[in-house]
């Protein structure tokens, strides 16, 4: 165990984590030069296209240090996006140290701070690494000063590297070996292994990534999953080098994969403890807290026959994505589908994209909403993730919305714009800290305002320089109402939204105008109305397409023309009673683009 080093690479989006991981793999000989490609650990095509990391990936490499000893490096490349911060905390639970990568040209950003605090809270040794020093705009001294001022850790011995050109990567490896402590032995010698991640493989069944804290796992041993109480027989164990490599056993302190032919998707929950069935450990390891989804949306198949396929696809995805929640839902407008819970908008986009690509499904998604707490008049509190399920207003005492604490890091010149944006979003300022050339602004904001487009607007008012990190704080009561959309007098449940009373009229008006452009013209007038309860707050009409019935009347009496027009009107009226309006997918997403 003395020569094992477990560490994660943490950083803000785009500061060069995956590129640094590539260089470390190359230097330790994990892959030959011809097998190397950029971001070799981002295996999913969506990750490669967007240039972001979504899943944390682990690699085990041998490294012969300058002191002549061979060390085993187990490292995990983590995502940088705020939606996937739970992936980072899970990865850190399996490590003793972390490399904090900071872009020397951009300086410290919000996620660098948030991830670093997570690492320090878990008692990890943090080694700062300044990346991109080959850029002409890189300023190593400023970046060091910012790390000390903003994060508050000593950056005197920060390693300055360029992951792109491979400069000084050997110094990073030496720093890992000498500064990150080896795994500590536990007080018990019985097997304890923490499940960091699980995914579904079509040939092997469920494969789990584990960190063995104590004891060892061998093929043929019978293991017990402590939370479910089920036992399984281990088929194979091994490590990723990044290729999957089988080993005769995984010992204490190591990070590797195990395959126990678990067929059930929920058989190996993330954060659970594995132990030997014949000689179990006295207690489970402290896992990590379950991530609660914050954003909910309905996903419906375009073709109703795809419903069973959608269920199977979501089941497989959930194994790979511990934060995804879903339950069946039926909607009058859309038929059968699922109400899904996500961590944020990026998470939602990626799940929908994966379902459409990997499982060939055509999906319609409804506008995302957050979870509200509803206090009913009989004193019960319910959590409501679907506006259509809001009880009748006479049964509701108060509605509470989720509030988040947002930390924004920005260069000084954009403060005015950012404060204005936060005020528009009903924010309450908590504090402003000046840290060198950067400013840290703290606000409490309603989550519903942040979820939809706050991130995009923040980037545009600060020319892309501001960065955001947020976490949930509490629920607050407020004057909320549900705005329903009626099309030709029929309520469309998938378009209902909950808004603050002060914004209700404006949102209703904007929604009707937006829908008017998106619903195709019919042979009869289509009335689009926004209503709060029985009170109509706005209306717009999609005019009917009509034939010019007077075209063949040349001159003649006016009563002849009137008769023809009346006859046409009667026909349209009859048609309106039986006609149904098809609502296109764009209309369901109109709610998203209302402020644009």
UniProtKB/Swiss-Prot annotation:
SUPFAM superfamilies according to UniProt: EF-G C-terminal domain-like, P-loop containing nucleoside triphosphate hydrolases
InterPro entries: EF-4, EFG_III/V, EFG_V-like, EFTu-like_2, G_TR_CS, LepA_C_sf, LepA_CTD, LepA_IV
GO cellular-component term (any): plasma membrane
Catalytic activity reported: GTP + H2O = GDP + phosphate + H(+)
The protein's name in its UniProt record: Elongation factor 4
Name of the coding gene: lepA
Compartments, record wording: Cell inner membrane
Alphabetical UniProt keywords: Cell inner membrane, Cell membrane, GTP-binding, Hydrolase, Membrane, Nucleotide-binding, Protein biosynthesis
PANTHER family assigned: TRANSLATION FACTOR GUF1 HOMOLOG, CHLOROPLASTIC, TRANSLATION FACTOR GUF1-RELATED
Organism: Xanthomonas euvesicatoria pv. vesicatoria (strain 85-10) (Xanthomonas campestris pv. vesicatoria)
Coiled coil: none
Residue span, tr-type G domain: 2-184
Membrane topology: Peripheral membrane protein
Lineage: Bacteria, Pseudomonadati, Pseudomonadota, Gammaproteobacteria, Lysobacterales
EC number(s) per entry: 3.6.5.n1
UniProt cross-references to Gene3D superfamilies, sorted A to Z: 3.30.70.240, Elongation factor 4, C-terminal domain (3.30.70.2570), Elongation Factor G (Translational Gtpase), domain 3 (3.30.70.870), P-loop containing nucleotide triphosphate hydrolases (3.40.50.300), Translation factors (2.40.30.10)
Primary location group: membrane
């Amino acid at each position: 165990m003395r020569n094992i080093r477990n560490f994660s690479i943490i950083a803000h989006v785009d500061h060069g984590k995956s590129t640094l991981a590539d260089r470390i793999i190359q230097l330790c000989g994990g892959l030959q030069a011809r097998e190397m490609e950029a971001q070799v650990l981002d295996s999913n095509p969506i990750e490669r296209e967007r240039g972001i990391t979504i899943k944390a990936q682990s690699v085990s490499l041998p490294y012969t240090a300058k002191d002549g000893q061979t060390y085993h490096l187990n490292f995990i490349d983590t995502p940088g996006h705020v939606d996937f911060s739970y992936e980072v905390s899970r990865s850190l639970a399996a490590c003793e140290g972390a490399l904090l990568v900071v872009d020397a040209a951009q300086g410290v950003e919000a996620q660098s701070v948030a991830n670093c605090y997570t690492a320090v809270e878990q008692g990890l040794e943090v080694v700062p690494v300044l990346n991109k020093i080959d850029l002409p705009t890189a300023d190593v001294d400023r970046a060091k000063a910012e790390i000390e001022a903003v994060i508050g850790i000593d950056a005197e011995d920060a390693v300055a590297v360029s992951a792109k050109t491979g400069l000084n990567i050997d110094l990073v490896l030496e720093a890992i070996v000498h500064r990150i402590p080896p795994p500590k032995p536990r007080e018990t010698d019985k097997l304890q292994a923490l499940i960091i991640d699980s995914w579904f493989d079509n040939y092997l069944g469920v494969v789990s990534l584990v960190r063995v804290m104590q004891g060892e796992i061998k093929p043929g041993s019978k293991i017990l999953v402590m939370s479910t109480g089920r036992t399984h027989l281990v088929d194979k164990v091994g490590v990723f080098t990044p290729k999957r490599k089988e080993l005769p056993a995984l010992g204490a302190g190591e990070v590797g994969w195990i395959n126990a032919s678990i067929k059930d998707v929920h058989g190996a929950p993330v954060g659970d403890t594995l132990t030997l069935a014949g000689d179990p450990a006295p207690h489970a390891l402290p896992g990590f807290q379950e991530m609660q989804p914050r954003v909910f949306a309905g996903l419906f198949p375009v073709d109703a026959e795809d419903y069973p396929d959608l269920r199977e696809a979501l089941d497989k995805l959930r194994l790979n994505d511990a934060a995804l929640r879903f339950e069946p839902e039926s909607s009058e407008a859309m038929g059968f589908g699922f109400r899904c819970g996500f961590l944020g908008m990026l998470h939602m986009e990626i799940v929908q994209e994966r379902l459409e690509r990997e499982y060939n499904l055509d999906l319609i998604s409804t506008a995302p909403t957050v979870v509200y707490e509803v206090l009913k008049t009989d004193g019960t509190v319910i959590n409501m993730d679907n506006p259509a399920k809001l009880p009748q207003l006479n049964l509701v005492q108060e509605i509470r919305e989720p509030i988040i604490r947002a930390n924004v890091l920005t260069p000084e010149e954009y403060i005015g714009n950012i404060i204005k944006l936060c005020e528009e979003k009903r924010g309450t300022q908590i504090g402003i800290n000046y840290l060198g050339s950067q400013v840290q602004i703290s606000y409490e904001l309603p989550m519903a305002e942040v979820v939809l487009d706050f991130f995009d607007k923040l980037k545009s008012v600060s020319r892309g320089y501001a960065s955001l990190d947020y976490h949930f704080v509490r629920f607050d009561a407020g004057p909320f109402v549900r705005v329903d959309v009626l099309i030709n007098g029929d309520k469309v449940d998938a378009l209902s939204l909950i808004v603050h009373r002060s914004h209700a009229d404006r949102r209703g008006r904007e929604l009707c105008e937006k829908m008017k452009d998106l619903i195709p013209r019919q042979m009869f007038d289509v009335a689009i109305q926004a209503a709060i309860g029985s009170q109509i707050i706005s209306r717009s009409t999609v005019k009917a397409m009509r034939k010019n019935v007077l075209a063949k009347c040349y001159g003649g009496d006016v009563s002849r023309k009137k008769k023809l027009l009346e006859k046409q009107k009667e026909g349209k009226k009859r048609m309106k009673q039986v006609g149904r309006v098809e609502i296109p997918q764009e209309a369901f997403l109109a709610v998203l683009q209302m402020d644009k």
